[in-house]
Amino acid sequence: LQQKVEEGFRVLTLMTEVDKEVLDFIKQYQVIASHLYWAKRLGIKPSDAVLRRAKESIKSYWRWHIIDEKDPMYLFKGIEKTPRPHSIILNLPLVDALHESKGGFIKDGKLILRLNKKVEIKIPERALEWLNKRLAENPDRKTVRVFERRGRLVAQIILHKENIVIPPSNPLLVVVDINSSYGVVVHYWDGKLIKTEKYKPPNRGMKWHSARKLMKLRDNLYNQGCLTQEKINIYSALIRRTLSGSSRSWVQQTVDKIVRRIRRIAKRHKKDPLVLIDIPNDESLRGSVLQRTLLSFVKYFENILSWYGIYWDESRLYSKICPQCGSELDLEMRTKNARIMVCKNCGFKEERDKIPLYWALIKIKLLPNP
């Protein structure tokens, strides 16, 4: 493990209805920005007429980020390496620093935007409280992004924080096992196992049970010739509604809970945390009903750890290989809450969800290599 730079972001998204004049201004901006994007992408000189139109119709605080390549917020850095978009006119955002002299700023609990005319978006009380807490954590940069989505104005306040982190020498070890068939298991270790917590995503509970029943019923009726296409569509809509909803909120709430606990336990033990994250290989995740939820969890979790400057590392921590001799483990017994694994070579026995902790201790040299 080596010193590295971690970048974390926090985003507050606000939406509001606006009049046609504001939406027309955004669309006009997107046409100009798209022309400059394609000129940059294709390595050709932008049209003088478009540059003149940009100067006349777009204020400088929105304009420089699509024209000046030396601008720190230049939108088109490294676009040559990105996938080529299918659309000619892109939904490019207006971007600027969050400041009273710029295109957007906060005043009296409102986000004030200068979009050809003044636009005020009231920030809900809970969102404003959250934003003030994040601002108190001293982000390095504060920016605002503005774009149109389905006829509504979307504004995102983006806070950015960069931390230089080094691996702690005597850490509070936190092992996060992303399990392709269960969910998330978290171990806290400081010389001994402090606690183990398990988090199961909501889409592994009654929702999937109900969806499977609906799909089985639909397929049986279809095979008997009892369903028209219209009825099949109704069943499909019921299945989608059954599975809709809460995976994103589960990810955010679970990550926030785990990070709060990491910081609290680390403070109580007077140690810096080291978080090792075990992500299953793509083959074990592919086709899993948990795939999207777990990968979203990992991405959001690493982002929040980076925001707080907590050292994390993705590590392969085995659950089917014996940490004592390196042989393959066999399932000895399965209960409602645990799977007991045993090594026929050396006799090692442990709950499967705890085996990654042994490999984490091997990685930081608190246990010998098998």
Specify the residue positions occupied by each region the protein language model found.
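Acidic carboxylate diad motif detector
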Residues: 41-152, 295
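Acidic, low-complexity intrinsically disordered regions
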Residues: 34, 58-60, 126, 204, ...
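Generic structural motif
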Residues: 17-21, 95-97, 116-118, 126, ...
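Intrinsic disorder/low-complexity detector
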Residues: 21, 70-73, 93, 118, ...
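Exposed regions on extracellular, virion, or secretory-pathway luminal proteins
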Residues: 19-21, 70, 131, 135-139, ...
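A contiguous, well-ordered beta/alpha segment that forms the leading edge of an enzyme domain
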Residues: 2-66
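Short glycine-/small-residue-rich flexible loop motifs, especially phosphate/cofactor-binding loops
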Residues: 36, 73, 302
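Positively charged, helix-rich recognition surfaces that bind polyanionic ligands
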Residues: 3-16, 25-29, 155-370
